[in-house]
A protein has these predicted regions:
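Short, Lys/Arg-enriched N-terminal segments with co-localized hydrophobic residues
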Residues: 1-17
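Short, intrinsically disordered, charge-balanced linker/junction segments flanking boundaries
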Residues: 13-18, 46, 287-291
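Polar/charged alpha-helical tracts
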Residues: 15-17, 44, 216, 249
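Generic N-terminal initiation segments characterized by hydrophobic and/or small/turn-forming residues
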Residues: 8, 15, 111-114, 266
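Glycine-rich phosphate-binding loops that contact phosphosugars or nucleotide phosphates
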Residues: 146-154, 161-291
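Tryptophan-centered motif/residue detector
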Residues: 3-4, 115, 247, 286
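Extended, charge-enriched "interface" segments that sit outside catalytic cores
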Residues: 21-160
Length: 291
């Protein structure tokens, strides 16, 4: 988002922004909302029978049978009305429409924001340099799923022809946070529903003791490593990758038979033959959404 409060000048005649981008604290409805701080005593609101009724009322249905429940948040009808007024003044709906239609929403870096296209097509096709981005993301998702299914089925195996049992991700920042959060959130559910496939570990700390501890906890011969770096030049990630490659080599293993890359099509990793495969992402999806 832009840090200023002036209208954004588009970088391309076909990429335009109709909404006005201003900091929230310049909006009158923001001042009204700020004045409602501590308006709701959540401990009282959630107690007794009124708490149960609140849980029923402050819930919104989502896809796949999920419910978003915000009963434990410090809101009531007054606060919700103030939030709606802020959304209107900030042109939230207009900006959301511009986002899914491919406008330059990340005005600081002059980029579109397209992580939503990894899930579905909400608006008009978004085409960049002749490439339909929805089709591109779906193709990469299919490539990743096909690779994972082959690993699970024992079609992609280690040098001894044995199945991989552990996957270790090497990344930093959002590229670590997103996959780690998903794994933590879904691990127990997958085990309870008999869909758990492989144990996952994560290396993100550049302290070699951290990487060494992770490697000591896995059987290297049966471990598959995913190197995640959009640019392919992230120093911390490449440092940890080198550490892992050294450990694999010392164990008598060929690192190229144990590694795959998640990167951009233009990165050095994409052109390397040191990986089993490469899954591509681009500059329009941030690291934490790349999982």
């Amino acid at each position: 988002m832009t840090n200023g409060d002036s209208d954004y000048t588009p970088i391309d005649k076909e990429e335009y922004i109709m909404a006005t981008w201003k900091n929230l604290d310049t909006l009158s409805s923001y001042d009204k909302l700020s004045g409602l701080k501590n308006h709701v005593d959540i401990a009282t609101a959630m107690s007794g029978e009124q708490g149960g009724e609140r849980v029923k009322n402050y819930s919104t249905p989502m896809a796949a049978g999920l419910q978003y429940n915000y009963a434990a948040k410090e809101v009531d009808e007054t606060v919700l009305t103030a939030l709606a007024e802020l959304a209107d003044e900030a042109q939230l709906i207009d900006k959301f429409e511009e986002l899914y239609n491919g406008a330059v929403i990340n005005t600081g870096e002059k980029r579109m924001v397209l992580h939503h296209l990894a899930r579905t097509q909400l608006g008009n096709p978004v085409v960049v340099d002749g490439v339909d981005k929805r089709e591109f993301y779906v193709a990469q998702q299919k490539k990743a799923a096909d690779f994972a299914n082959k690993v699970h089925a024992g079609e992609i195996v280690n040098e001894a022809g044995e199945k991989f049992t552990t996957v270790v991700q090497i990344g930093i920042g959002g590229s670590d946070l997103g996959p780690r959060a998903l794994y933590i959130a879904l691990e127990n559910w997958a085990k309870a529903n008999n869909t758990f496939k492989m144990e996952a570990k994560f290396i993100s700390n550049v302290d070699p003791d951290d990487a060494a501890a992770v490697l000591a906890s896995v059987d290297l011969a049966h471990a598959l490593f995913i190197v995640v770096s959009k640019s392919g030049t992230t120093l911390e990630t490449l440092t940890n990758e080198a550490f892992v490659k050294d450990a694999l080599t010392k164990a008598g293993l060929n690192p190229s038979k144990h590694m795959l890359a998640v990167t951009s099509e233009t990165s050095p990793l994409a052109k390397s033959d040191e990986y089993l495969t490469a899954i591509f992402m681009d500059d329009y999806i941030g690291g934490r959404y790349s999982s």
